[in-house]
């Protein structure tokens, strides 16, 4: 139920935003980097260390906070519409969670088949091809390794 309320709220927010004459809606992937839940001492890291997150077939798309901020600035000059702001590699949690766990020095996660119906990645093709946006951190796997070693 809480997820449905969140999704309904976002849908209403987007619907309301489109009442404006010009609006660009940026749909960000899961943020990582400084100041996010995914930092080495963040909420997600603690859950991974405590083995509270299970690796599944569910797909996620990530975006480094630096790329998210750059997209927001560039979007000031983009035409109205909805644009996904994600890196180049959507991944199952079976792919990203072990790499993340290693980056923070946590044990390997438990693995389970299946996924939630809402777990799916996104594409940045529109941002790249129509607006020339290119992520500075195109790969979550390199991004995880780099920002955790800072």
Ranges and model annotations:
Residues 34-43, 94:
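Short beta-loop-alpha junction of Rossmann-like oxidoreductase domains
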Residues 69-118, 124:
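Mid/C-terminal beta-alpha module of Rossmann-like enzyme folds, strongest
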Residues 107-150:
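C-terminal amphipathic/interface module of NAD(P)-dependent oxidoreductases
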Residues 43-83, 90:
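Alpha-helical substrate-binding/gating segment
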Residues 14-34:
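Conserved beta-loop-beta element that borders a ligand/cofactor-binding pocket
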Residues 8, 60-63, 91, 122, ...:
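Residue-level signal for the nucleotide or nucleotide-sugar donor/cofactor binding architecture
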